[in-house]
């Protein structure tokens, strides 16, 4: 498929178009809950969950040299009972079709080593709430681009609004290899943006899965919720000379 698009305005408890891994589930209220909470809604430690779209996405084509541009938007909240002890974060990712949950905690279910490795074939936009110094994390909550490594190639400070719904738009323009992520809190009108050049065709396989991964801390009460309320995605294979990036505004 040269073009793919889908919209989840909310999620269904038995959603056929979602692959749930680890602790991820859809609540009766239609919320994609990536990590565990107890019966009182309190997040639990050492939890890891992922959710991906059921169909693989064609991100580039070796026969034609075409590379996809894409736009995805989603709404999520992170809520920590104690803002002083939070971990670890949520990520939107593109990874090989056979990708399975990896190490939890600071690895966010996407990697298993602090060392970069081309075999991961993974690109992620992380919303990271914990400073893992071994991953060269900055000393604050941040948005980061992860390319074959949990150590981000670029980060920007992100002021987490505890329990507030954030709206995220991530776009990739294949003509100029530009990856852009923005996060807005509509209630407080604060926004954060990160952009960098990433050549997806040199990192990812031709077909990928797209979705979310999240994890809580293993010890010390470093816990938070990771809830996704809605998600849309559109991609289109395009040549380098294309002018059609109209869908990149995310609708």
UniProtKB/Swiss-Prot annotation:
<dbReference type="Pfam" id="PF00139">
    <property type="entry name" value="Lectin_legB"/>
</dbReference>
<comment type="similarity">
    <text>Belongs to the leguminous lectin family.</text>
</comment>
<feature type="binding site">
    <location>
        <position position="137"/>
    </location>
    <ligand>
        <name>Ca(2+)</name>
    </ligand>
</feature>
<feature type="binding site">
    <location>
        <position position="88"/>
    </location>
    <ligand>
        <name>D-glucose</name>
    </ligand>
</feature>
<feature type="binding site">
    <location>
        <position position="130"/>
    </location>
    <ligand>
        <name>Ca(2+)</name>
    </ligand>
</feature>
<dbReference type="GO" id="GO:0030246">
    <property type="term" value="F:carbohydrate binding"/>
</dbReference>
<dbReference type="GO" id="GO:0005509">
    <property type="term" value="F:calcium ion binding"/>
</dbReference>
<dbReference type="InterPro" id="IPR016363">
    <property type="entry name" value="L-lectin"/>
</dbReference>
<feature type="binding site">
    <location>
        <position position="132"/>
    </location>
    <ligand>
        <name>Ca(2+)</name>
    </ligand>
</feature>
<dbReference type="GO" id="GO:0050832">
    <property type="term" value="P:defense response to fungus"/>
</dbReference>
<feature type="binding site">
    <location>
        <position position="218"/>
    </location>
    <ligand>
        <name>D-glucose</name>
    </ligand>
</feature>
<feature type="binding site">
    <location>
        <position position="106"/>
    </location>
    <ligand>
        <name>D-glucose</name>
    </ligand>
</feature>
<dbReference type="InterPro" id="IPR050258">
    <property type="entry name" value="Leguminous_Lectin"/>
</dbReference>
<dbReference type="GO" id="GO:0030145">
    <property type="term" value="F:manganese ion binding"/>
</dbReference>
<dbReference type="GO" id="GO:0032991">
    <property type="term" value="C:protein-containing complex"/>
</dbReference>
<dbReference type="InterPro" id="IPR000985">
    <property type="entry name" value="Lectin_LegA_CS"/>
</dbReference>
<keyword id="KW-0106">Calcium</keyword>
<comment type="function">
    <text>Galactose-binding lectin. Exhibits hemagglutination activity in a calcium- and magnesium-dependent manner. Also binds to several carbohydrates including lactose, D-galactose and GalNAc in a calcium- and magnesium-dependent manner. Likely to have antifungal activity as it is able to inhibit the activity of the A.flavus alpha-amylase.</text>
</comment>
<comment type="subunit">
    <text>Heterotetramer consisting of heterodimers of alpha and beta chains.</text>
</comment>
<dbReference type="GO" id="GO:0031640">
    <property type="term" value="P:killing of cells of another organism"/>
</dbReference>
<dbReference type="InterPro" id="IPR013320">
    <property type="entry name" value="ConA-like_dom_sf"/>
</dbReference>
<keyword id="KW-0295">Fungicide</keyword>
<keyword id="KW-0929">Antimicrobial</keyword>
<keyword id="KW-0464">Manganese</keyword>
<feature type="binding site">
    <location>
        <position position="217"/>
    </location>
    <ligand>
        <name>D-glucose</name>
    </ligand>
</feature>
<keyword id="KW-0479">Metal-binding</keyword>
<dbReference type="InterPro" id="IPR001220">
    <property type="entry name" value="Legume_lectin_dom"/>
</dbReference>
<feature type="binding site">
    <location>
        <position position="142"/>
    </location>
    <ligand>
        <name>Mn(2+)</name>
    </ligand>
</feature>
<feature type="binding site">
    <location>
        <position position="128"/>
    </location>
    <ligand>
        <name>Mn(2+)</name>
    </ligand>
</feature>
<feature type="binding site">
    <location>
        <position position="137"/>
    </location>
    <ligand>
        <name>Mn(2+)</name>
    </ligand>
</feature>
<keyword id="KW-0430">Lectin</keyword>
<dbReference type="InterPro" id="IPR019825">
    <property type="entry name" value="Lectin_legB_Mn/Ca_BS"/>
</dbReference>
<feature type="binding site">
    <location>
        <position position="126"/>
    </location>
    <ligand>
        <name>Mn(2+)</name>
    </ligand>
</feature>
<protein>
    <recommendedName>
        <fullName>Seed lectin alpha chain</fullName>
    </recommendedName>
</protein>
<feature type="binding site">
    <location>
        <position position="128"/>
    </location>
    <ligand>
        <name>Ca(2+)</name>
    </ligand>
</feature>
